[in-house]
Amino acid sequence: AGDTVTKKKQALGLLLLAGLLWLGGTMPVQAQCVAKNEAFQSGEHVMYDLYFNWKFIWKKVGLASLTTNGTTYHSKPAYRFNLLSAGSKKTDFFFKMRDTLTCYVSDKLEPLYFRKAAEEGKRYTVDEAWFSYNDGVATVKQKRTWHNPVREPQEMEYSDSRCIFDMLSILAQARSYDPRDYKVGEKILFPMATGRRVEEQTLIYRGKEEIEANNDTIYRCLVFSFVEYKKGKEKEVITFFVSDDKNHLPIRLDMYLNFGSAKAFLKSVRGNRYPMTSVVEK
């Protein structure tokens, strides 16, 4: 049962990983975490519909919202990202999910702080990550606090010569990278803090495709695969479809799980920095 809860959490929460799509190059990202914001502005608000395949029938199971706001962090200019994903009252009967993720990055898009409060089934946990930089080395301190069931907190610290991201700061920085030089089959590698550990992540660029969202609009998208490797075999976990324009917004996600499939569709967006030039005229 615990494994099923974890998998369902990943199915509805993996929307966050959409930001992983835009790290450039096949080489690991260097420790330099500074970048110029070329993609978003304060006030951006994006909504998604979440679906799950239950016995060959697609059922709407919830919503997710992602907001971006200018703020300060330790008295310095910063951006704050909030992502809320919640199941509907109907699906609460089978599995209750309320996830709230908050991330702060500097005005130069350096990861600063990450927090995930997750109410999933009967479990309630809070994951936190604090980022620091010294002499070209990135360090992250992580802590998981268990509120239900009550357990001892789990803590860890990790340093890397590369930049370390969390699930939201990667979205903030990577959306500004230019993907025009990507080649089909190209692999993108980087470390990411998950709240309890730092894991190596792999994405593969698959090409372009036209995708219809839940706002009756078709978008020209770049397609990426998030993959895992087990015993030397490649397994596709998520397929991302991202707008082929300056906004680089996730339009659709397909998630392949041991117990079924899940999808997330763009429902609405406002406050985007650029026109959605990826829209395909019908």
Where does each model-flagged region fall?
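N-terminal secretory signal peptides that target proteins for export/translocation
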Residues: A1-K8
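Intrinsic-disorder-associated interaction segments
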Residues: K9, L16, E157-D160
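Residue-level detector of intrinsically disordered/flexible regions characterized by low predicted structural confidence
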Residues: K9-A11, E210
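Bacterial N-terminal signal peptides
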Residues: G13-G24
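Sec/Tat signal peptide C-region and signal peptidase I cleavage site
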Residues: T26-A31
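Acidic, serine/threonine-rich low-complexity disordered tracts
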Residues: Q32-Y133, S176-K282
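Active-site/ligand-binding surface loops and adjacent short beta/alpha elements
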Residues: Y133-M192
